[in-house]
Amino acid sequence: MNLKEKTRALFAEIFSYPATHTIQAPGRVNLIGEHTDYNDGFVLPCAIDYQTVISCAPRNDRTVRVIAADYDNQVEEFSLDAPIVTHDSQQWSNYVRGVVKHLQQRNNAFGGVDMVISGNVPQGAGLSSSASLEVAVGTVFQQLYHLPLDGAQIALNGQEAENQFVGCNCGIMDQLISALGKKDHALLIDCRTLGAKAVSMPKGVAVVIINSNFKRTLVGSEYNTRREQCETGARFFQQPALRDVSLEAFNAVASELDPVVAKRVRHVLSENARTVEAASALEKGDLQRMGQLMAESHASMRDDFEITVPQIDTLVDIVKATIGDQGGVRMTGGGFGGCVVALIPEDLVPAVRQAVAQQYEAKTGIKETFYVCKPSQGAGQC
């Protein structure tokens, strides 16, 4: 039974009437463009075929009722006429509450909803299960009540909910790709303007995500430190963000910068350039050049931004040794663990899977998790 069938059946069973709509919103993986989003730079993610699915129907009152199928059918209920505050024990419900609260501030022309939620985006793997949930909930209200909100506004609403209601800092990429993703395409997103350009993916290429399952500990504090170092760099150049600094300008005065800040700045500037070129390489079907850019990105994250760990570097080395110049591999996400992403010909997937299974655990003592994904459509009815 797929997620649509599961949520529709559960909806009818619990609420004793059929759902009128089923909405999905996907998770995502970032192919290239790491730690560029909060520097007003470029990112190149694609939506993946793991998603949050919500079967739903409008109510004729002001109550929101939610069933979390993946949490033992826990029930959440709140009124649109009372102040929406955080739930003490059901953390999942705060994503729903936050999205609804911020939707009210944007466009309050909606009533109550019954919904059943289920998803298969792996949690804690850096594949944006939370953004997928936020965008799915926003799309439910937009579709049921014909709200005049586009995908970018639904994405911004989800980001606000996560930052201000749930209390977790995030850029806009995760929600934007979940809302705007296009089947068989990646999306080159300008994080300053929120402009997005669909980039066709070469035929016969698989998106492989491998979770190192290394438990991240430093990610919060180190993320904030990197952000501060980037802001220091932008101030040095008297620019609002590193997006506005050219590599030429940087190279001319790099020796005057604090050495660590200089390394951080060099990563962001070079990564922005790589991301724009990667979009062009993908469109041309030049998997070899894409692989080189991904390798340069990983080296920059390892040596200049210093956010990889030995387990991640080991995974990258195993995949690279298996695929040679037929595709690319790099760490993806915030760093200090998490996942690597590889773009490889579909016929090489079994060899990569076997090489990783044979070598990664033997070298690190940790068992990986292996996902093969397709670039998928963004949020909407399913």
Curated annotation (Swiss-Prot):
Disulfides per UniProt: none
Enzyme Commission code(s) on record: 2.7.1.6
Residues that bind ATP: G124, A125, G126, L127, S128, S129, S130
InterPro entries reported in the protein's UniProt record: Galactokinase, Galactokinase_bac, Galactokinase_CS, GalKase_N, GHMP_kinase_C_dom, GHMP_kinase_C_sf, GHMP_kinase_N_dom, GHMP_knse_ATP-bd_CS
An individual GO BP term: galactose metabolic process
Major location (coarse): cytoplasm
Annotated site residues (Transition state stabilizer) in this chain: R28
GO terms of molecular function: ATP binding; galactokinase activity; magnesium ion binding
Pathway recorded for this protein: Carbohydrate metabolism; galactose metabolism
Family of the protein in this entry: Belongs to the GHMP kinase family. GalK subfamily.
Designated name of the protein: Galactokinase
Native source species: Salmonella paratyphi C (strain RKS4594)
Species lineage: Bacteria, Pseudomonadati, Pseudomonadota, Gammaproteobacteria, Enterobacterales
